[in-house]
Amino acid sequence: MVSGGRVGGGEGEAGEAAEVAVAMVDNEEEMAQAQAPPAAAVAARELVVGYALTSKKAKSFLQPKLRGLARKKGILFVAIDQKRPLSDQGPFDIVLHKLTGREWQQLLEEYREEHPEVTVLDPPGAIEHLLNRQSMLQEVSELDLSDCHGRVGVPKQLFVNTDPSSIPAAVMRAGLSLPLVAKPLVAKSHELSLAYDPISLTKLEPPLVLQEFVNHGGVLFKVYIVGDAIRVVRRFSLPNVDVGDLSNNAGVFRFPRVSCASANADDADLDPHVAELPPRPLLEILARELRRRLGLRLFNIDMIREHGTRDRFYVIDMNYFPGYGKMPGYEHVFTDFLLSLVQKEYKRRPSYSSCEG
């Protein structure tokens, strides 16, 4: 708008009209630029990512290659002091976290309400769904992906929270077949056991989830999801179990985890039918549906292919904010993802060049 101008006649009036028109055009251009800033303007502004991670998680995730690339792209990681109110820190564009506990969740929810402009990865309420193995795979079981380049399901499973001596009878009633994989109810632990016979079931320690073991050629597919990006890594897993194994083995065999990062199977000489990755269209549909249903953007899926089939897959586990540091090229995927979260309207933040955690 033009203020303080005098309305007159003739050339003066036409001149002022022209000035008003120019001012309106300038204002429209400024508004358009504010709504959709050029890439150069975005790159010139620091993207501040506050992180609240355990020391172990911070070390594995914030590797030098991630920090270095992030600095080049204008992304700054700042450690959040859990002993201070979140509102007294920052300001942040994004809060990245993987902490548990009701107190932290409440603090984070209050912060989200006070600062809706900040992206929190991910909402505490959504994360809860993946912390309990009783409900973790429910969303997968409800999907209908039968016509999506393959079939995806979950193994038959049973939640057990009773006296161990009653487990064999509960397994029989549920119609589960041995061997069974026993997993802790709380997903923070990756330890699991393989029980071969009914007697061994009585040696398990509830609460836990029992899952039918599906032969899968000893190869597991770790599907990493970072926003819209999907990356798949092959890992060696538990070998097939045949009838002879069932008759010759007894007891409970404990494993630290199903797969091991050091046992990468991508370069191994494997049977092509075992090593073939799940179809890309199937993974894209599965990831999209789970993102929508779970309300999460950072998680991974452990998938197996039933041995002897080409298109029958099972999801056996899911994890929030998994070990992305083990994913090849994760620093490029993750920094691109963080930049994609920047909102269209940018507010100038103070410099944090001396505050990097």
UniProtKB/Swiss-Prot annotation:
Q: Output the superkingdom of the source species.
A: Eukaryota
Q: Name one GO molecular function term.
A: inositol-3,4,5,6-tetrakisphosphate 1-kinase activity
- Tell me the cofactor note: Binds 2 magnesium ions per subunit.
The UniProt induction remark is: By drought stress.
Amino acids binding Mg(2+) 2: 317, 319
- Give the cofactors, semicolon-separated: Mg(2+)
UniProt cross-references to InterPro entries, sorted A to Z: Inositol_tetrakis-P_1-kinase (IPR008656), InsP(3)kin_ATP-grasp (IPR040464), ITPK1_N (IPR041429)
Annotated ATP binding lies at 133, 183, 211-222, 237, 262
Any idea which positions bind 1D-myo-inositol 1,3,4-trisphosphate? 56, 98, 190, 222, 319
EC assignment: 2.7.1.134, 2.7.1.159
One Gene Ontology term of the biological-process aspect is: inositol trisphosphate metabolic process
User: Catalyzes what?
Assistant: 1D-myo-inositol 3,4,5,6-tetrakisphosphate + ATP = 1D-myo-inositol 1,3,4,5,6-pentakisphosphate + ADP + H(+); 1D-myo-inositol 1,3,4-trisphosphate + ATP = 1D-myo-inositol 1,3,4,5-tetrakisphosphate + ADP + H(+); 1D-myo-inositol 1,3,4-trisphosphate + ATP = 1D-myo-inositol 1,3,4,6-tetrakisphosphate + ADP + H(+)
Keyword Calcium found: no
Amino-acid positions noted as binding Mg(2+) 1 in the UniProt annotation, renumbered to this chain: 302, 317
Tissue-by-tissue expression: Expressed in roots, leaves, flowers, anthers and embryos.
Q: Which Pfam families match?
A: Ins134_P3_kin (PF05770), Ins134_P3_kin_N (PF17927)
Query: Which keywords annotate this record?
Result: ATP-binding, Kinase, Magnesium, Metal-binding, Nucleotide-binding, Transferase
Q: What class of enzyme is it?
A: transferase
Q: What does this protein do?
A: Kinase that can phosphorylate various inositol polyphosphate such as Ins(3,4,5,6)P4 or Ins(1,3,4)P3 and participates in phytic acid biosynthesis in developing seeds. Phytic acid is the primary storage form of phosphorus in cereal grains and other plant seeds.
State the similarity comment: Belongs to the ITPK1 family.
**What is said about its interaction partners and assembly?**
Monomer.
Protein name in UniProt: Inositol-tetrakisphosphate 1-kinase 3
